[in-house]
Amino acid sequence: MIKLMTDNAANLPPDLRAQYGITELCLTYTIDGEPVDISKPFDGHAFYEAMRKGAEVKTSMITPLAAREAMEPVLDRGDDVLYVGLSGGVSGTCWGVSVVAQELRERYPDRDIRVLDSRGASLGEGLIVLEAADMAQKGTDMETIVARVNQLIGKMRQHFMVDDLKFLRKGGRLSGAAAFAGTLLQIKPILQGDPEGKIVVLSKERGRKKAMDTLIQLYEEMVEDKSAPVGISHAAAPAEALHLATALRQAGCTGEILSVCHEPVTGAHVGPGMLALYFYSQSWR
């Protein structure tokens, strides 16, 4: 049997994790220096409202101990492990889990332990994990699942708009001057995950409506198979997420649309008001 593992940056709701038997390892975070209890349900509205009011959020990677404690019981009962994790372009988490996996391979030479960098975050990671878990539940072998996951990683496209450029400035994505000017001019950048899993600016739009129209246009122009699943994540912007989902249906999307409040781990770096769209495509912008 193959056990699927991921991290909380994959943004998968608890019911889906339970349905597919997915184990979630957790990156942790603090708000104004106070550790947050990650065992409690995430209150996205309160989290992003605190950020809007100036709260300082800092995140930490999964510890080696946490990774080891999650994997050892699975290996002890004779199962294999496939971990699909947060992009190495924005976090060292996948690398850290890889180190633990190598240690465990030496202790469990008969077990198959794989660690794959999704080069994504939120549902750009989560949608891939769901398909891998579905394949594992159906008894698909490890090599076939890994090949499929790598194929999906190469096709996943992640585009998002942000409301306030200061969070990108803090993360070194924009200069302070550019962030200040952008705020004055109501410039809303459209960003994307590049082939290496790093965040880059795709375009800059005037106002949120134009930025959302651009997200919809990207879907219309790039997606070859409109029956494929799509992901939407929002940072305390549920009405806009619903509007985006409706617009996707009008644009011909017939696949499942999974919409979630964006998790805090990468949400800390994009800030409140972020709206993201995740889909599969053969092309890049």
Question: What do the predicted segments below correspond to?
Answer:
Residues 66-97:
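N-terminal glycine-rich phosphate/adenylate-binding segment common to multiple enzyme folds
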Residues 3, 9-23, 28-30, 90-93, ...:
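Mixed-charge interfacial surface used for oligomerization/domain docking
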Residues 85, 114-115:
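A glycine-rich beta-strand to alpha-helix segment
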Residues 1, 77-80, 253:
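Short loop/turn motifs at secondary-structure junctions
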Residues 3-66:
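N-terminal glycine-rich anion-binding loop in soluble enzyme alpha/beta folds
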